[in-house]
Regions:
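Glycine-rich loop(s) and the adjacent beta-strand/alpha-helix scaffold that form part
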Residues: 1-5, 125-126, 130, 183-191
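A glycine-rich dinucleotide-binding beta-alpha-beta segment and adjacent secondary-structure elements
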Residues: 105-169, 199-212
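Mid-to-C-terminal Rossmann-like scaffold of FAD/NAD(P)H-dependent oxidoreductases
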Residues: 2-40, 45, 194-255, 261
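Rossmann-like dinucleotide-binding core of oxidoreductases
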Residues: 1-94, 98-99
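Glycine-rich phosphate/pyrophosphate-binding beta-alpha loops
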Residues: 167-175, 231-233
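A glycine-rich phosphate-binding loop feature that marks nucleotide/adenosyl-phosphate handling sites
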Residues: 1-8, 69-75, 136-145, 198-214, ...
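Internal hydrophobic alpha-helix adjacent to the cofactor/substrate pocket in enzyme cavities
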Residues: 177-200
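Extended, charge-enriched "interface" segments that sit outside catalytic cores
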Residues: 229, 241, 246-312
Length: 312
């Protein structure tokens, strides 16, 4: 929708995190990060829901044109109105599509209803009375392979040399597709070169968990990766991803020399600190005094600093 057609004075501002709290995804990012844009939140209302329900049979999702099972974790607005009939409102997040654009994306308002119905129900929302749709919402239905017909390398068992990723494999989501694409592309290249292919066990990564779930369990609806799917989630953390996966990437030719040198430097710092903690002994009296000064329950006795870090 067009930014200038929205009355932001009727919406709730959703500011981003302070710059000081921003954390990059990659250990390689060292450039300063800034939150330059704000998001907003609007809410549907009973009139919005009435318009949607009055036209529900015009939705391909409910009129029989689309028969596939939709995504479980990001349902359309008509799905939410039907499934959660007891709720008198649903949130819609208004997100800028970029730093220098007038396009705003309505997160939580995906729909397959015709454009005239979309215009009607969007304009029933406070702050959206004069909204202009730049590109209407739409629904798609796509086929996928049975993921149990894939090897753990993401190669098809039926068509050798064919590797799949993303929606083709029955998943939903950008990160899920990107991760599978990395693995499938790597293995396709190594297969072409006659080299050993990479299989990631469940305990190594969320990608390993995702692939194992796909090829052993299959899917009934578009698969999304969540921490709750992994029995190893306490050890699969973003702060140790570098240590878990960079050596594997190096072994399989994905990590260049400069990145490997930075990784080794970081590991040497960590190892030096581990040695320092292992060699540091704290007397009981000194430890109790320090903990009491910090407002913590005093330790029963002193010991090696490395072991004291395990204290809950």
């Amino acid at each position: 929708v067009h930014r200038r057609s929205i009355d932001f004075s009727q919406l709730e501002c959703q500011p981003g995190d302070p710059d000081s709290e921003l954390q990059p995804f990659s250990f390689l990012t060292d450039a300063p990060m800034h939150n330059k844009v704000e998001c907003w939140i609007a809410y549907t209302n009973p009139e919005t829901h009435r318009i949607i329900l009055d036209n529900i049979q015009r939705s391909p999702l409910y009129g029989g044109m689309i028969e596939g099972v939709g995504p479980r974790y990001c349902p359309s607005i008509e799905d939410k109105v039907v499934r959660f009939a007891g709720k008198d409102r649903h949130p819609i997040f208004v997100e800028p599509c970029g730093e220098n654009t007038e396009e705003m994306y309505l997160q939580g308002a995906s729909s397959s209803l015709p454009e005239d119905v979309q215009n009607a129900f969007y304009r029933s929302i406070r702050g959206f009375e004069n909204i202009e749709i730049m590109r209407p919402a739409y629904a798609i239905e796509y086929d996928c392979v049975d993921p149990t017909s894939l090897e753990a390398t993401l190669e098809s068992k039926v068509v050798r040399g064919l590797y799949g990723a993303g929606q083709f494999n029955g998943t939903s989501g950008y990160e899920e597709a990107a991760a599978q694409g990395l693995l499938a592309g790597l293995n396709a290249a190594r297969n072409a070169l006659g080299k050993e292919q990479l299989i990631l066990p469940r305990h190594t990564s969320y990608l390993g968990t995702l692939v194992d779930d796909l090829v052993t369990k299959g899917v009934m609806d578009p698969y999304r990766m969540m921490t709750s799917r992994s029995e190893y989630r306490l050890t699969l953390r973003q702060d140790n991803a570098d240590q878990r996966l960079t050596p594997i990437g190096r072994e399989y030719g994905l990590v260049q020399d400069d990145r490997w040198a930075k990784y080794q430097h970081t590991q040497s710092i960590l190892e030096a600190e581990r040695r320092r903690l292992h060699e540091t002994h704290l007397r009981t009296a000194d430890l109790r005094a320090a903990m009491e000064a910090a407002g913590l329950a005093p330790a029963a006795e002193g010991g090696i600093a490395e072991e004291l870090l395990r204290r809950p």
